[in-house]
């Protein structure tokens, strides 16, 4: 147990700087991620799922940016539970989300509605399933050459997806394959939790012959051992090792004993919910 607590304290933040849009990956709680999305041109910033508000305020100050916007992926406390306190600490914030259960909500996002954070363009994507009001946020710099970013909350994880608490396999298929999966392959994926190693161990169980799974697992173990985040991934990568993004592949369908994506999604999710993660 000591090792676990020790590791929690050691989880490092990470700066992803690929152009005008800068993303600060901020570990929170035990395995959550918050993301400070900075427009380098205007020094305006948004925060995704600020469950630890004090840390968010300190990070914004450290980077010399003005926090204008909260992007909430869904209403669960470990994502939305800091909103009300953050708004007290930083009055006047715009708080976006797709669900009336979200604390501090000022702007309700709908599918394909857009907003600006400085010169960055943010598109809301409705991805109901984990929760009925789940939203992912697709962020681009118009006219810029840097890859887009998508903040996927508990819809898409590195090598996994969220539990279907308020939705169906059909909805998760739509979210992963039709909504998220159609964005450019180099889109950076920033998810809500660090579940990468366990997800990849399940992916290995589903497709034991998939070299992409083995390689990513070795890489993720290395990252974990030095306390570094395994985010972001890319959509292109997810299609190579994420069983829930691969429900159209024969290997995944055969494992599930199905021939169509939706029943495959249902079967693979059900199996993942019961999966005992091996130690290695």
UniProtKB/Swiss-Prot annotation:
Chain residues that bind substrate: 163-165, 193-195, 269-272
Tissues expressing the protein: Testis.
Cofactor binding notes: Binds 2 Zn(2+) ions per subunit.
Pathway: Secondary metabolite metabolism; methylglyoxal degradation; (R)-lactate from methylglyoxal: step 2/2
UniProt binding sites for Zn(2+) 2: 78-79, 154, 193
One Pfam family per UniProt: Lactamase_B
Known EC number: 3.1.2.6
UniProt key word Metal-binding: yes
GO MF annotation list: hydroxyacylglutathione hydrolase activity; metal ion binding
Residues involved in Zn(2+) 1 binding: 74, 76, 130, 154
Residues with the N6-succinyllysine modification: 201
Enzyme class at the top of the EC tree: hydrolase
Sequence positions bearing N6-acetyllysine: 61, 88, 201
Catalytic activity line of the entry: an S-(2-hydroxyacyl)glutathione + H2O = a 2-hydroxy carboxylate + glutathione + H(+); (R)-S-lactoylglutathione + H2O = (R)-lactate + glutathione + H(+)
Highest taxon above the source species: Eukaryota
Family to which the UniProt record says this protein belongs: Belongs to the metallo-beta-lactamase superfamily. Glyoxalase II family.
PANTHER family listed in its UniProt record: BETA LACTAMASE DOMAIN, HYDROXYACYLGLUTATHIONE HYDROLASE, MITOCHONDRIAL
Subunit structure: Monomer.
Entry function: Thiolesterase that catalyzes the hydrolysis of S-D-lactoyl-glutathione to form glutathione and D-lactic acid.
Listed name of the protein: Hydroxyacylglutathione hydrolase, mitochondrial
UniProt organism field: Callithrix jacchus
């Amino acid at each position: 147990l000591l090792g676990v607590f020790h590791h929690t304290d050691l989880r490092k933040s990470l700066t992803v700087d690929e152009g005008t849009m800068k993303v600060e990956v901020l570990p929170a709680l035990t395995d959550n991620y918050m993301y400070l999305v900075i427009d380098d041109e205007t020094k305006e910033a948004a925060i995704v799922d600020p469950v630890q508000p004090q840390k968010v305020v300190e990070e914004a100050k450290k980077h010399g940016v003005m926090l204008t916007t909260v992007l909430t992926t869904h209403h669960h406390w470990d994502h939305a539970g800091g909103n009300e306190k953050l708004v007290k600490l930083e009055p006047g914030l715009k708080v976006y989300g797709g669900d009336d259960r979200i604390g501090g909500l000022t702007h309700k996002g709908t599918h394909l509605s857009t907003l600006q954070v400085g010169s960055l363009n943010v598109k809301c994507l409705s991805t109901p399933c984990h929760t009925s009001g789940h939203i992912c946020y697709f962020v681009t710099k118009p006219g810029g050459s840097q890859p887009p970013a998508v903040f996927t909350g508990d819809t898409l994880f590195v090598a996994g997806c969220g539990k279907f608490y308020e939705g169906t396999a059909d909805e998760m298929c739509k979210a992963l394959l039709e909504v998220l999966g159609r964005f450019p392959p180099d889109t950076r994926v920033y998810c809500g939790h660090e579940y990468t190693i366990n997800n990849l161990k399940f992916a290995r169980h589903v497709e034991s012959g998939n070299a992409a799974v083995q390689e990513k697992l070795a890489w993720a173990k290395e990252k974990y051992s030095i306390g570094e985040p395994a985010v972001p991934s890319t959509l292109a990568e997810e299609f190579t090792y994420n069983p829930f993004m691969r429900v159209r592949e024969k290997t995944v369908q055969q494992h599930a004993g199905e021939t169509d994506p939706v029943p495959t999604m249902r079967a693979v999710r059900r199996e993942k919910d019961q999966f005992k993660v091996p130690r290695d």
